[in-house]
Amino acid sequence: MAGSIIELHTEVPADQESNVFGQFDEHLKLIERTLNVTVISRDGVLKILGSEQNAASAKKLIDELVVLAKRGNTITRQNVNYALSLAMEQRNEVLTEIDKDFICNTIQGRPIKPKTLGQKEYVDQIRKKMIVFGVGPAGTGKTYLAMAMAVTAFRNEEVSRIILTRPAIEAGEKLGFLPGDLQSKVDPYLRPLYDALYQIMGADSFAKNMERGLIEVAPLAYMRGRTLDNAFIILDEAQNTTPAQLKMFLTRIGFGSKVIVTGDASQKDLPRDAVSGLDVAMKVLKKIDDIGFCQLTSKDVVRHPLVQQIVQAYDAYEKKQKPERPARGRRGGYER
């Protein structure tokens, strides 16, 4: 009968209960609230009460979480939230399929894997294409996953070096006007890249390869006039490049190289009337076969759940605030 309550059962191994259930059963409570079911745990057996569709979705979701837990994953609230969004689309099995895509381990032995469909598509694009643009809000893993792919290619001797770069003009500051030598000037801008490499490679391995010139972390301006062969190159914060800077960077690419360009169009530090090189490149290059584009969204945020809510709130606010821009003239071939 339509709307009738059914009862389903599933088992959770005793050694995985705390991981799957969450602290104070927060994961189960979240599943209950979202899918409108009741979950009762007794001696490792879960009794799920709800409508036929909701109870079935809850059972599939919990079974997927158990599979993830058995593979050594720590189940987080973000995992559960994402699993619930997939359950709403009747795509529960996608979560464990994504989890099969192993990239590498951190120095502490933690596996690095894509955690969402958007991240999986991004990683697949990196494997297939010579140049990939990964664009999306903070917390979507676009830079970290690119770093993990770079380290994997380096370890597998697919490339002979890793080059990481960022535009060094952010928040209105120019390197030439900052005190100190080059290293002290660029460190604040490049620190996030160092931190990610330390976590993946370990400080000792990073320092050794840096000393040998096999890893280079430098401002974007230092790419000018070079040809970058047999390298895995990551340009981070590309929304802060000008069209000329990004064109300069992309034309440095040599044989045997792979390039990842990451950026967040909502966090530009360019002067108000400046055109972002990232925006221009995504329009100009979209029809070239060996260039991939991956647009990550708030659904792909894998930091604290609050970050996802912040991103969504700002997106909604900016859509309301965005004025109609009058047509402008052209300078240097780019619309201003």
Language model features with spans:
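Compact, well-ordered interaction domains used in eukaryotic information-processing assemblies
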Residues: K29, L35-T38, G44
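Short amphipathic alpha-helix segments
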Residues: D15-R33
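Conserved helicase motor core of SF1/SF2 NTP-dependent helicases
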Residues: I107-Q119, Q125-L235, Q239-R336
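Short glycine-/aliphatic-rich beta-strand segments at the starts of folded cytosolic domains
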Residues: A2-N19
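Interdomain "pre-motor" coupling segment immediately N-terminal to P-loop NTPase/helicase cores
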Residues: I40-D99
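A positional/architectural concept
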Residues: G3, F21-F24, S41
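Hydrophobic side chains in well-ordered alpha-helices
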Residues: V20, H27, A58-L61, L246-F249
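Conserved loop-to-helix interface motifs that mediate assembly, gating, or partner/ligand docking
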Residues: E89-L117
